[in-house]
Each structure stands twice: as structure tokens, then as C-alpha cells.
A protein has these predicted regions:
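A generic "folded-domain core" signal
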Residues: 28-224
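Bacterial N-terminal signal peptides that target proteins for export
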Residues: 2-14
Length: 224
């Protein structure tokens, strides 16, 4: 996985069936189990030690790599390796930060493994009344046939803006989440498992904790 600032083309559409029927808009989704709420994070802001311990607990759930040359940290979900091993699909977020800087970068990798060739150009996430559409940038999308595993694979990367991470919070509050991989008239629908949901929850939780922590607090959690 390359540590780069990736380009993206993302379109969000929020389908509200209740609204079309004249009903009120549904409330925003509740935080899933195991996810630290934003209110809880705000309460910890005055207690640096609590922030450090919360960060350590969140970091322990993901993969961590440090680049001494770039002085950067990369965090990614174990779900990607699991999906590759099982020849299945996943949405795998990854995060990177730089020593001494406040910015937190959040990317999403959509990975497909299956029997059909799908040169990805569009991805959809359906969860309840929410429908989010991702238009793949050819520069950050690829596909091929793996002769060793005997499966077709495809991958598309998106760099997400802070407001767009709310899309994940929204879908995590729904009972069923489906990702549709589409391209050149071919498509495949993948229903998220409990492991998929937990993996994304863990990464969103880590992102929220990193955003609210100072570079000094992050350093204590990562190097302490």
C-alpha cells in the first residue's frame, strides 16, 4: 500500500424513501458497539492520560507501520489481509499521520476478489435508506487475473474528506450493508459480515481519537 496523497472522485447520494413518502428524515445513525462516541472523546480531552490510553487501545486493534524517512505512521485494518486470504471482498480504511503535525489522512480501499472480471468504474454502498456512490479514478484503480489464486481481483482507492467519513458512521448504524462493485456491465454485490463492520468501526474510532489528540499525545501513545 503506497503512502501517497491520493486523488479521488466521490459522489454521495442520500436516498430517503421516507422523505419521498412525506415522512420526516431519519435521524443520523447511532455509533455501533465498540465505537468511542464523539461526546466521550470530548470528555477525555482534558485528561491527556485518558487520551493516551484510549489511543493505545485503538491502535492495538490495527496494523501499524512507521516510515523513518518520511517520519510518518500508517494504520491499516487486518480485514484486508483476511479478505485476500479468503478470496473475498472488503472495504479497508487506512490512516496516516506525520510526526509533529496535526493532520490526519483517511483513505478507503475497495477490494474485490471473485470469479468475474470487473474493471471497476463505480462502487455503491447501500445501507438502509443510505446510498453512497463512488466514481473510480482510473489513476487509483486497477484489476487483473491472479493466476496463482485463480481469481479476478480489482482495487480502487479514495482519499476521504473529514465530512465524508460521516458516510461510514451512517452506514454502520444500519443492520445490513451491501457494497456493489460495478464496471463494463459486470457487477457483484457483497454483503458485509460482522468482521467487516467491526474492522471499519475500529478504523473510524481510531481516526476520531487521532483527530482530537495533539501531536504530543499521539507521540506518547505510539512511542510510550
Amino acid at each position: 500500500m503506497k503512502l501517497v496523497k491520493c486523488g479521488k472522485i466521490v459522489v454521495a447520494s442520500l436516498c430517503m424513501m421516507a422523505t419521498l413518502a412525506g415522512a420526516a428524515m431519519p435521524a443520523l445513525a447511532i455509533s455501533p458497539a465498540g465505537c468511542t462516541s464523539l461526546a466521550q472523546i470530548e470528555e477525555m480531552n482534558d485528561d491527556e492520560e485518558a487520551q493516551v490510553q484510549a489511543l493505545k487501545a485503538a491502535i492495538a486493534k490495527v496494523n501499524v507501520k512507521y516510515d523513518e524517512v518520511a517520519q510518518s505512521w500508517e494504520f491499516d485494518s487486518p480485514i484486508y489481509d483476511k479478505a485476500e486470504k479468503n478470496k473475498t471482498c472488503c472495504l479497508s480504511p487506512w490512516i496516516y499521520i506525520f510526526d509533529g503535525r496535526s493532520e490526519v489522512y483517511f483513505d478507503e480501499d475497495f477490494s474485490y476478489n471473485g470469479n468475474s472480471e470487473i474493471p471497476l468504474d463505480t462502487l455503491y454502498i447501500r445501507a438502509g435508506d443510505y446510498l453512497y456512490t463512488y466514481e473510480c479514478d482510473p489513476d487509483y484503480t486497477d484489476y487483473a487475473y491472479d493466476t496463482d489464486k485463480k481469481v479476478w481481483w480489482a482495487l480502487s482507492n479514495f482519499e476521504m474528506e473529514p465530512s465524508e467519513i460521516d458516510w461510514l458512521r451512517n452506514v454502520l448504524g444500519e443492520k445490513k450493508i451491501i457494497t456493489r462493485y460495478y464496471g463494463a456491465g459486470a457487477q457483484y454485490d457483497y454483503t458485509w459480515t460482522a468482521d467487516d463492520r467491526q474492522a471499519v468501526t475500529d478504523m473510524v474510532n481510531l481516526y476520531d481519537l487521532l483527530v482530537t489528540a495533539s501531536p504530543e499525545v499521539r507521540a506518547r501513545a505510539l512511542r510510550g
